[in-house]
Amino acid sequence: CGPDAIDHNQEASEIELEVGTIVAAIGYDPFDPSGIYQYGYGRYTNVITAMEIERMINASGPTGGHVIKPSDGLEPKRVAFIHCVGSRDETIGKPYCSRVCCMYSMKNAQLCIDHEPDTEVTCYYMDIRAFGKGYEEFYKTSQEKYGIEFIRGKPAQIFENDDLTLTIRAEDTLLGKVTEYTYDLVVLSVGLEHAEGSDELRQTLGVSKSADGFYMEAHPKLRPVDTLTDGVYIAGVAQGPKDIPDSVAQGSAAASRAAIPMAQGQVEIEPIIAANDEAICGACEVCVELCPY
């Protein structure tokens, strides 16, 4: 884009387009951890999310790339990252793995040490899921080169001390004991959830959803970007949590699939419609959620 390509004064408007195919790539929303009371987000000054520390680390961010404590603006000496906040937790309705938290936590932990080599960093994890190309080597580098400490166990509670430092109580499942360590800054590695408004769009497109709220594909292996609605395709986190390489690959696949009916010019659709039997219908509307037609 050239200079002044973005019109900041533009107002919201509704337009109507006639299209042949649709690719739903609506992204995601980061999980809001304020509902997990024991972690104190929104109550404790020095408890932040991964998105907030990403903003700090960015050279064009408000701190010029330096990680600081929100309480006093000073650089923290001890930093803790808590993985799986808003993921793999059935108590809050998020039983799925977000697939990105482990790796972006290690990335941010390394950057903290790059900016301030004396920083002590600890990662609390349930399981390290370094599944992608080069990810296991990245995990090994975090341990051996950067000296990041990994504690296997999900923290039970965070306490704020009088000096605004934070004490994490957690069970180290490898040692089989409860630990309490104090940190200057705690970062909650939040998971991914379906974007706001995605359910309304899903109903408009006539697409089914999985139990976790993401759009359901026609077949997880054979048609991973197709839906049961002809002409509608899905890509990225709209279909389920995934990282950038997988999102890019799926976006390319969805574009290729969408190009097929466009190149043909016309498509024959199956004349299948759904009808309800008013004599036995209880008006529960469960069929609306389940029926692909």
Predicted regions and their residues:
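Residues forming the flavin
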Residues: 1-293
